[in-house]
Amino acid sequence: MAQRITLHDMTLRDGMHPKRHQISLEQMKGIARGLDAAGVPLIEVTHGDGLGGASVNYGFPAHSDEEYLRAVLGELKQARVSALLLPGIGTVDHLRMAHEIGVQTIRVATHCTEADVSEQHIGMARKLGMDTVGFLMMAHMAPVQTLVQQALLMESYGANCLYITDSAGHMLPHDVTEKLTAVRQALRPETELGFHGHHNLAMGVANSLAAITCGATRIDAAAAGLGAGAGNTPMEVLVAVCERMGIETGVDVFRIADVAEDLVVPIMDHPIRIDRDALTLGYAGVYSSFLLFAKRAEAKYRIPAREILVELGRQRLVGGQEDMIEDTAITLARARGLPVA
């Protein structure tokens, strides 16, 4: 029997990062219709930093989470909608709102060593009867045994699926194999395993295939790779490769390629590719959504973005510390005698 996986689209959530959270409702509805028609079963919709992400730190979106979610939910014929929630950014009130308007899957995301902060949110989601996913970010930063312990914590809180997340696009296939094999062996058989990759070292597809080989049944990807850094695993490429390998996705390769080419590429503010800064993200192991913040700091303080990113990697900054990026740029500028006023 052919192996079957669930592809989870990131275009309308992780894709908000390179769009500075400014995707219009009409653009979002059009892309959602295309994804739905292509057979994508699960589509994530929120601010790039999850429910409640609208802020000075993370950026103000063109519309509220509720407006985006309602717009997409009204367009779908077969796909389900998920929302991301980072404790400390999103609250249980945001979670209840998403559930009340029809979101069926919630993904509760923490840094890979901080699963304990997810207990309230995972517990509430399970109480509401939602498909509840624990999402361990920046997984390259934790040794295997730590990752296993954190995954087991999320499972004990009620998560029915655990994601290992390569937020920096830093992992290589052997890293994925080592970590996902250990987590898969530790989880209950009925608990699903997922993988979220970034393409900063061009490993998105290869890492996803490694994850599938280890027993992952949910894989994140984005049409045309639209996402932070050099983007997420490109959905259309992953679908084509899976089809060649006999892995069933339920997604039509030509329809998803058309969504990427006709709907997603035209709205890009800049090409999603492995430029020197995105490469630095993957090489240094820095959170992918830091890229635009580093580029803004470069323009303001005349410190090359990649030098800022390398320093962030040295400091081991993690998601949620975006406010430290400007501080780092100021420190580097002062060290060189550059004006910071």
Swiss-Prot record:
It holds the Pfam family HMGL-like. It comes from the Bacteria. It is an enzyme of class 4 (lyase). The keyword Manganese applies. The active site is at 17 (proton acceptor). SUPFAM superfamilies: Aldolase, post-HMGL domain-like. Keywords: Aromatic hydrocarbons catabolism, Lyase, Manganese, Metal-binding. Its EC number is 4.1.3.39. One of its GO terms (molecular function) is 2-isopropylmalate synthase activity. Residues 5-257 form the Pyruvate carboxyltransferase domain. Mn(2+) binds at residues 14, 196, 198. CDD domains: DRE_TIM_HOA. It catalyses: (S)-4-hydroxy-2-oxopentanoate = acetaldehyde + pyruvate. The record marks 13 as: Transition state stabilizer. GO terms for biological process: catabolic process; L-leucine biosynthetic process. Substrate binds at residues 13-14, 167, 196, 287. InterPro entries: 2-IPM_HCS-like (IPR050073), 4OH_2_O-val_aldolase (IPR017629), Aldolase_TIM (IPR013785), DmpG_comm (IPR012425), DRE_TIM_HOA (IPR035685), PYR_CT (IPR000891). NCBIfam families: 4OH_2_O_val_ald, PRK08195.1. Belongs to the 4-hydroxy-2-oxovalerate aldolase family. This is 4-hydroxy-2-oxovalerate aldolase. It comes from Cupriavidus taiwanensis (strain DSM 17343 / BCRC 17206 / CCUG 44338 / CIP 107171 / LMG 19424 / R1).
